[in-house]
A protein has these predicted regions:
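Boundary at the C-terminal end of the N-terminal hydrophobic targeting segment
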Residues: 21-25
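Short, structured beta-strand/loop micro-motifs enriched in basic residues and often containing a Trp
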Residues: 47-58
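Bacterial N-terminal signal peptides that target proteins for export
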Residues: 1-10, 91
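Bacterial N-terminal signal peptides
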Residues: 10-18
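Sequence context surrounding c-type heme c attachment/ligation sites in exported
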Residues: 26-47, 63-154
Length: 154
């Protein structure tokens, strides 16, 4: 599948991706998925979620390294319409940042990962957007807080 078929508005997002330099700042939604690779699709809670990560991060994993700081994982959640992607519900980003996650309570902290969530119009959701994400990903400490780490490696 081509990205444009999965993410028809990718071109409208622009062409650049800016990494977050300081921990504690909400990650930015990439302006484009250029340089990202689709690595997983999951269905949960009436949603279909496609996940993307930078090709350079996958290459690091495949060469036996851990995911480097600056790694961004983008999730695009669609309404599940009988097994087909409906409208985009939200965009989610996890970004691994040196000393990241320090502003989250220890009970939900996910290592150095920062999280953010965005509306279909790409506006940052600020009223408790990621508590559910943090709680769920906390269970994946053994895989750098990621679901699908093995898919990234293959």
């Amino acid at each position: 599948m081509e990205l444009r078929n999965l993410f028809p508005v990718a071109g409208a997002l622009g062409a650049a991706f800016f990494l977050i330099a300081d921990a504690g700042a909400a990650p930015s939604l990439p302006a484009s998925l250029n340089g990202f690779v689709h690595y997983s699709t999951s269905n949960y809670g009436g949603k279909i979620s496609d996940k993307y990560v930078q090709k350079t991060s996958i290459q690091a994993l495949q060469s036996g390294k851990t995911l480097p700081n600056g790694t961004a994982v983008v999730g695009i959640e669609y309404r599940d319409q009988n097994g087909k992607r409906g409208p985009v519900l939200r965009y989610i980003i996890m970004e691994k940042v040196r000393n990241g996650g320090k502003d989250y309570p220890a009970s939900v902290r996910n290592g150095d990962w920062e999280f953010a969530s965005f509306t279909p119009a790409r506006a940052l959701i600020t009223n408790d957007p990621v508590t559910r994400c943090l709680a769920c990903h906390k269970s994946q400490a053994q895989s750098d807080y990621l679901f699908g780490l093995n898919e990234m490696k293959s």
